[in-house]
């Protein structure tokens, strides 16, 4: 192996409680927030359902799911994510975000572990001295599926 550090492409997304870093391959599209269809008897983080390319997607607030404040809907965007499970029940889901995401190239030595601030739903890390959360997507998806 040469001396160059390994690189990966990621998407840095702003939320109410900070920023999350997702693998580029999980983000299908970023769209403008539209008022979702209401759903009954769901947790507060389950905002509603929305239509996207023939699919009915759950729209969730990752911030509320992780104990932060709700994103305001002004300037809100929606990140459409491919579900890792790839099941037919939930092939995609949607996360509320703030503003436009940023594509980033990340060298392995730029990402430093901050495990003391990690939780059930995310790993915490430093990216160029900025705290970012890396969602535990399997756990997030499992939680969403429990409420479909």
Question: Where are these predicted regions, by residue range?
Answer:
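An acidic, low-aromatic, low-complexity terminal/linker signal
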Residues: 1-148
């Amino acid at each position: 192996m040469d001396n160059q550090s390994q690189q990966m492409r990621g998407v840095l997304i702003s939320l109410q409680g900070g920023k999350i870093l997702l693998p580029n391959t999980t983000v299908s599209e970023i769209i403008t927030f539209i008022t979702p269809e209401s759903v009954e008897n769901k947790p507060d983080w389950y905002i509603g359902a929305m239509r996207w390319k023939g699919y009915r997607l759950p729209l969730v607030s990752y911030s509320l799911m992780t104990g932060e404040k709700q994103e305001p809907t002004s300037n809100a965007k929606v990140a459409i994510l491919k579900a890792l499970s790839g099941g037919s029940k939930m092939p995609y889901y949607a996360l509320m975000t703030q503003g436009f995401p940023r594509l980033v190239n990340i060298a392995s030595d730029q990402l430093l572990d901050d495990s003391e601030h990690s939780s059930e739903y995310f790993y915490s890390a430093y990216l160029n001295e900025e705290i970012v959360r890396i969602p535990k997507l399997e756990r997030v998806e499992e939680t969403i599926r429990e409420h479909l």
